[in-house]
Structures are given as C-alpha cells and as structure tokens.
C-alpha cells in the first residue's frame, strides 16, 4: 500500500471516529442498583441524571452509607455500560481499529 492511500485510509478512519464520538454524545445508557437507584449517562460516561425511588430513601433512612454505596454501584454500572457502548460503536464503525480507539475514549 502506498503512502497516499494509507494517509487517505487514516483520514477516513479519523472522520468515522469523530462521527462516532458525536453519536455517543447523544446516546444514553442507564445504570441501576437494586431497582432503587437509576443513573443515566451518555455514551462518553458523563452523568446526565440521577433518580432515587422513594423506597430507597425509606430503606436507607438510618443507613446513609448504604445509600451512598447504592449510588456508587449505579454510577459504576452506568459508566461500564457507556464504556461498552463506546467500544461496540467504534468496533461497528472501524473494526479492529475501532476497538483500540474505543478503549481510548
């Protein structure tokens, strides 16, 4: 493969990666913990919303640390799902190169 062709392919891959990044900004995932807490994040893992069911406040009324743990679990779940979504979208668009790029974002 000559240098010009390689450069063109790299530019196409870069453009596709940028398009995926824009899509991920609009895509959302939801992480949860015991059905009491939900965390919504975009495809980059940025937290967009946090929802507590009233039962969560009642169940952890005397255990604020337990509620904090539940929140962390839901946040981590949302971020894990966002990371998996990012890898999947990059791989779908760019194949093996996409998987490498997905790990970077």
Curated annotation (Swiss-Prot):
Pfam families for the chain: YbaB_DNA_bd
Keywords: Cytoplasm, DNA-binding
Locations listed in the record: Cytoplasm, Nucleoid
Keyword Cytoplasm attributed: yes
Keyword set includes DNA-binding: yes
Annotated GO CC locations: bacterial nucleoid; cytosol
InterPro entries, alphabetized: YbaB-like_sf, YbaB/EbfC
Gene3D superfamilies according to UniProt: Nucleoid-associated protein YbaB-like domain
GO molecular function, one term: DNA binding
Similarity comment: family membership: Belongs to the YbaB/EbfC family.
Function: Binds to DNA and alters its conformation. May be involved in regulation of gene expression, nucleoid organization and DNA protection.
Subunit and partners: Homodimer.
Full protein name: Nucleoid-associated protein TTHA1599
């Amino acid at each position: 493969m000559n240098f010009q062709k390689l450069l063109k392919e790299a530019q196409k891959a870069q453009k596709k990666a940028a398009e995926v990044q824009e899509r991920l900004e609009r895509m959302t995932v939801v992480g949860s913990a015991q059905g009491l807490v939900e965390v919504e994040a975009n495809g980059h893992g940025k937290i967009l919303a946090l929802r507590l069911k009233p039962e969560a406040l009642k169940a952890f009324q005397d255990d604020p640390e337990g509620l904090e743990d539940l929140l962390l679990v839901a946040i981590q779940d949302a971020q894990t799902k966002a990371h998996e979504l990012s890898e999947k979208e990059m791989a779908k668009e760019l194949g093996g190169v996409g998987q490498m790029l997905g790990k970077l974002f």
